[in-house]
Amino acid sequence: FITMSKEKMAKSKGNILKISDFKKKYNGQVLRLALMSTHYSQPLDWNEKLMDDCQRTLDKWYNCYVPVNKKILIQDDDLNPLYDDLNTPGYIAVLHKLYDKAKEGKQEEKEIFITACKFIGLLGQSKEEWDNFKKQNLKLSENDILKKIDDRNKARDKKDYELADKIR
């Protein structure tokens, strides 16, 4: 079952959320990663922090994105968590390790990482498509963001670090 901030989801409690509502705010890949973050036989606590963590993870992973135009085999050792009762959290841990190798910059390591992600339906868009989705869903305009950056820099220049951190 799914809980909403540690409270069981129920129509009577009014804490039911529709996937269509989430898709307005989050990319489908964020939903996918959130759902796979807990083993299918365990309860899932659905909350804003989970979604934000998954969003940040995918943002980080997309920084390593390269198009893969050749067939790359995923090593059995990397797939072992999925062989073990479809342990998706274990496979996500493998993806984090592959990411650590990929971020060192070697093309081959990046291709292995991207292929392993695509195997479970992640990183299926180009970096440009991913960034465009995020821009479309920003609550701040580009001018608002630039103004906040300017305000933050001014606060830092005045050594008002508390204000600068708040603006960030």
Segments predicted by a language model, with ranges:
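Basic helix-turn-helix/winged-helix DNA-binding cores
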Residues: 2-3
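Structural preference for alpha-helix termini/caps and helix-kink/transition segments
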Residues: 7-168
